Structures are given as C-alpha cells and as structure tokens.
Design a protein with these regions (language model features):
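C-terminal motif of bacterial Sec signal peptides marking the signal peptidase cleavage site
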Residues: 28-32
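Ligand-binding pocket segment of bilobal, Venus flytrap-like solute-binding proteins
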Residues: 187-252, 258
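Ligand-binding cleft/hinge of the Venus flytrap
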Residues: 66-73, 156-213, 217
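Extracellular/periplasmic juxtamembrane helices and adjacent flexible linkers that interface
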Residues: 7, 35, 266-345
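Short helix-loop capping/hinge motifs at secondary-structure junctions, enriched
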Residues: 144-151, 169, 182-190, 264-269
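N-terminal segment of the mature folded domain
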Residues: 38-169, 308
Length: 345
C-alpha cells in the first residue's frame, strides 16, 4: 500500500458547483448552526459530521453508522453526512462546511486540506497510510458484454460510446484517467501516446457527470456502451439487477481513498475512524463491494487481483499528478477537455 502523497453523441457535461457558490452554501450551513458550542470544524460532543465523496454514502448510512452505534464507543453518537463529487466536497470544507471526518476519492483533496491547516500533517501515518478502503478501476458493460470489451485497448479500437465522470470535479474520474494512461505506458507506449489514448477515450465520451455515482446512474438509465467505474459501483449495480456486468482489465490501477478526522474534531470522530479500520469495519466495506485495506480480510475470489496492478505512486503521487494532469490552467487533461469544449471551471 502506498502513501497518498508518494510518488497521490451530443456531448452532455456536468461539473461541480462554482467555488463562489460552494462558499455561499457553506456559509449558510455555518450560519444555520449559530448559537452552538461547535468548533471551527463543526464537530461537537457526540456528533460526527461526515463529508465524503459520492459512492460510499449508503455504506455509511446503512451499515457503518448503525454498526458503530451498537458498540460501547458508539452509544449516543449522532451522525450527519454530506456526499458528492470529491473535489466539490473538499472545496466546501475549505469554505467552512462543518466536518469532523472527511473521506475523499483521491489523495490530492486530503493534501489540500492538510495544507489549509484543517487536517493534521500526520493523517496518513498509521499502518494503513490513512486509506479507508480500496478498489480498482473496471470497465462496466451491458449484460453479455455485447461489444466484447476486455481491456482499455478496446475503448481505443472499437466504435463504442463511453461514460466517465468529469475529471475536473470527480476524484473517481481522475482514477479512471490514470488507469487508462498507466495501462498504455505498461504496454510500452510513450507518454505522448498514452496521453493521446486518453484524448481518444474522452472524444468517445458522451456524458461526463459530476460524480462517479451520477455516472453510474446515467449508465444504468441506458446511456453509453462502457462505463469507466470503481469496481464497487459495478458490483452494486450487478447486485441490484441492473443491465450491467463488469470486466477487470488485465492492467489497471489500485484505488486508495484517504480518510481522516479534522483538527479539533470530537473524540467520537476518532472513535468512529478507529472502528472503520477495525476488522468489523473493514468487513463491512468488503460486504459492500470495496476491497479492505486489511489484506487478511481480502477475498480473492470476490476480488481477483489483476495481472498488472499499479499504484498512483508510479506517477509521482497525487500532488504531482494533480499539477501535471488536472490543474485547471496547465494540466494536460484539462487542456484536452478545453479542446473538446468541456467546461473546466
């Protein structure tokens, strides 16, 4: 496991809320909490304010929270939650949205909160390197795989319509891009050829929703032939009887989602985080289609290990990757999106 900082048709596009609007919403939330003894991070007493990326919402509300409440540490603890595109969620916390536990899709968002002084610098210094759970990027297709999709290369050579979230708002989309890019490098292609492959797939992308959860919704509603997705999202869709199955590409990236308590968070938030890393908490993630960070609990029948599984550290970690690929002004992927007419702000 790697440290997050190592190395961290008609086109329809939906991206996150503008920064100014996020700040206004966050300010309204804080104002609505006036008169309490809450700290600057919004944590108080026995309440845990969760701000997280979109896909694990039901794992928290339906499984993790009730299981924790049944423990001796969780008695009397209350929860509030906000879930959405990872980048939007991080910007909301920066703007003042109450948060005592933050869980993002990729390390760049957590590092930004660390640099803003809202998360302690040692957030990633435990045995799991601050990672809540893992997944891999997969290719979700229609039942029976009518297009015969087996790898990222098929997205380049076949006449297919693709769905992936917008990489300027969605952490999941950034994992998708780096999975595709890395798979090409591992075939021996140059960095330019790998970036050209990313451009080709984005050209075939018919919709770029703001989050991974919204991208899955578009796919299950019948749009597109292939969805670049978290493995857990594909598993969820299959289990719910959607017209979906998925392919684990032979070469793909390990997804690591960082989690931390904010500075000045109540003890209940740390207790909940400790529960998430416990065997019981990790088993809950596994039961919901995520790969546990506790390797002793990994079921390799349910979660096959790809032939060529690589990490974000291979590209310099999320700080470097964010600057090189996803910076709105100078990032290589942002430049491709601008060329394709996709909003980047």
């Amino acid at each position: 496991m790697r440290n997050a900082r190592e190395g961290t048709r008609q086109r329809s596009v939906h991206i996150g809320l503008p920064a100014a609007l996020l700040a206004l919403v966050a300010a309204m939330v804080v104002a609505g909490c006036g008169g309490s003894d809450d700290s600057a991070t919004g944590s108080s007493g026995g309440n845990v304010d969760i701000v997280a990326y979109s896909t694990p919402e039901t794992v928290y509300t339906d499984s993790l929270e009730p299981a924790f409440e049944a423990t001796s540490d969780g008695g009397g603890v209350g929860f509030s939650g906000s879930f959405g595109a990872s980048g939007d969620q991080r910007r909301a916390v920066e703007a003042g949205q109450p948060a005592s536990l933050v869980h993002f899709a990729q390390g760049g968002d957590m590092i930004a909160l660390e640099e803003a002084g809202q998360v302690a610098p040692n957030w990633d210094q435990n045995k799991y390197k601050g990672i809540g759970q893992e997944s891999v990027v997969v290719l979700a297709v229609r039942k029976g795989n009518p297009e015969g999709i087996k790898s990222f290369d098929d997205l380049l050579t076949k006449d297919v319509e693709v769905i992936t979230p917008n990489p300027l708002s969605s952490g999941g989309a950034r994992w998708n891009v780096m999975a595709l890019y890395g798979s090409q490098l591992h075939e021996g292609k140059s960095e330019k050829e790998a970036l050209d492959a990313v451009k080709t797939v984005l050209e075939k992308t018919i919709v770029q929703p703001g989050s991974a959860r919204d991208a899955l919704a578009a796919f299950t509603q019948g749009e597109g032939d292939v969805l670049l997705a978290y493995e857990n999202e594909a598993i969820k869709a299959e289990e719910e009887g959607e017209d979906v199955e998925y392919v684990v590409p032979p070469s793909t990236i390990r997804i690591e989602t960082p989690i931390a308590v904010t500075k000045d968070a109540a003890d209940s938030a740390q207790s909940f985080l400790d529960f998430i890393w416990s065997d019981e908490g990790q088993q809950i993630w596994s039961d919901n289609g995520y790969r546990p960070v506790n390797q002793a609990l990994l079921d390799e029948q349910k979660f096959p290990v790809p032939q060529d599984l690589f990490d974000i550290a291979e590209f310099g970690g999320w700080e470097k990757v964010t600057d090189e690929f996803f910076d709105e002004e100078s990032g290589k992927v942002a430049a491709i999106e601008k060329e394709l007419g996709v909003p980047t702000e």
